[in-house]
Amino acid sequence: MTARLQEFYKEKVVPELIKQFGYKSVMEVPRITKITLNMGLGEAINDKKVIEHATGDLIKIAGQKPIVTKARKAIAGFKIRQGYPIGTMVTLRGQRMYEFLDRFITVSLPRVRDFRGVSGKAFDGRGNYNIGVKEQIIFPEIEYDKIDALRGLNISITTTAKNDEEAKALLNAFKFPFRN
């Protein structure tokens, strides 16, 4: 059973983008390859439980176990030694990716306080989109009573688009709520 957004991509988005950009092959049409959720935890230096709580939150949000990212080199100013755990990240591909994107667009983004749409300028020049979430409680899987602290996370959407214009058209076709 494929995800709802995956079927929507094949049936509606691909023909729409072929018509808009004049692609000759279906394989030329940009698609989302992966979504990476990253939670940087600077406060984990003092308290090791922070990593456990953040990992638990990401498991609930993504539906799979994240990896703990470690410091590549020591930075005395931040009191970090090489190998210290400083964050968690999870990479979603395939069906889980489409299911997460569906939940994110339809349920989570409207729950953001004072939400007026996401910025259309957060593309990196190579067709990838980044969005920062200030609080993990916008996700319905996170119970407000059971969190220890509000943490933000970075969501990176990687596409096969050659430029930002194609990537924005792809995300617009997925009904991504851009404000500009």
From Swiss-Prot:
Swiss-Prot/TrEMBL GO biological process terms: translation
PROSITE patterns: RIBOSOMAL_L5 (PS00358)
A GO molecular-function descriptor: rRNA binding
GO cellular component: ribonucleoprotein complex; ribosome
Segments forming a coiled coil: none
Keywords for this protein: Ribonucleoprotein, Ribosomal protein, RNA-binding, rRNA-binding, tRNA-binding
Listed HAMAP family: Ribosomal_uL5_B
PANTHER family the UniProt entry points to: 60S RIBOSOMAL PROTEIN L11-RELATED
Function (record text): This is one of the proteins that bind and probably mediate the attachment of the 5S RNA into the large ribosomal subunit, where it forms part of the central protuberance. In the 70S ribosome it contacts protein S13 of the 30S subunit (bridge B1b), connecting the 2 subunits; this bridge is implicated in subunit movement. Contacts the P site tRNA; the 5S rRNA and some of its associated proteins might help stabilize positioning of ribosome-bound tRNAs.
Subunit annotation: Part of the 50S ribosomal subunit; part of the 5S rRNA/L5/L18/L25 subcomplex. Contacts the 5S rRNA and the P site tRNA. Forms a bridge to the 30S subunit in the 70S ribosome.
Family: Belongs to the universal ribosomal protein uL5 family.
Annotated protein name in UniProt: Large ribosomal subunit protein uL5
Originating organism: Ralstonia pickettii (strain 12J)
Organism ancestry: Bacteria, Pseudomonadati, Pseudomonadota, Betaproteobacteria, Burkholderiales
